[in-house]
Amino acid sequence: MQEKDSKDVTMEDEETIASQEEIEVEGNSEESSKEEESNNSEISDENLSEENLKLKDENEKLKNELDAAKDRLLRLSAEYENYRNRTAKEKEGIYTDACSDVINEMLPTLDNLERAASTEGSAEDIKKGVEMVVKQFKNSLSKLGIEEIPSEGKFDPNLHNAVMHIEDEGYGENEVVEVLQKGYKRGDKVLRHSMVKVAN
């Protein structure tokens, strides 16, 4: 019986040893999993810190780019406003200069008309004075590049304005018969169309 007991004890001891080994293995695996968790936690904390630093750097970089873009936009806006103001002043200056040139050319004609109106003389003298003023005025227009639109020949709707139509076999179709009011142009720009009578 004692042998049986010693075998039993041995078996019991073996079972106890085995269970203790299992407990140790479980304890070791728990410890190793805790260590792994701790290591993983440290790694993930490091990763988060690195990621956080990267995001902060990227955020700072984007903020700087945005500030630079805002600055460029403000400068461009100011430059555009200056350009608009400058061109408006230049345009006004050009218009004023053009008006001055025209007026300076016309003033002598006005002076002569006033002199003619204030003088006493015969109708022939007055007529002669008016003809001289007309000639002076045409010279002034010529200096400004303004010329009379020729009205002979065919009717041209780009240059003429037909205010009357007549039936006359002595003229060809759409031929200008008479100029009722002269037209003028400067270069290719028509300042005033000629008012004409046209044959049908």
Swiss-Prot record:
Q: Glycoprotein among the record's keywords?
A: no
Compositionally biased region (Basic and acidic residues): 1-10
What InterPro entries does the database record attribute to this sequence? Answer: GrpE, GrpE_coiled_coil, GrpE_head
Q: Which GO terms describe its molecular function?
A: adenyl-nucleotide exchange factor activity; protein homodimerization activity; protein-folding chaperone binding; unfolded protein binding
Q: What is its main location?
A: cytoplasm
* Compositionally biased intervals (Acidic residues): 11-29
Q: Name which cysteines form disulfide bonds.
A: none
Protein name per its UniProtKB record: Protein GrpE
Organism of provenance: Clostridium acetobutylicum (strain ATCC 824 / DSM 792 / JCM 1419 / IAM 19013 / LMG 5710 / NBRC 13948 / NRRL B-527 / VKM B-1787 / 2291 / W)
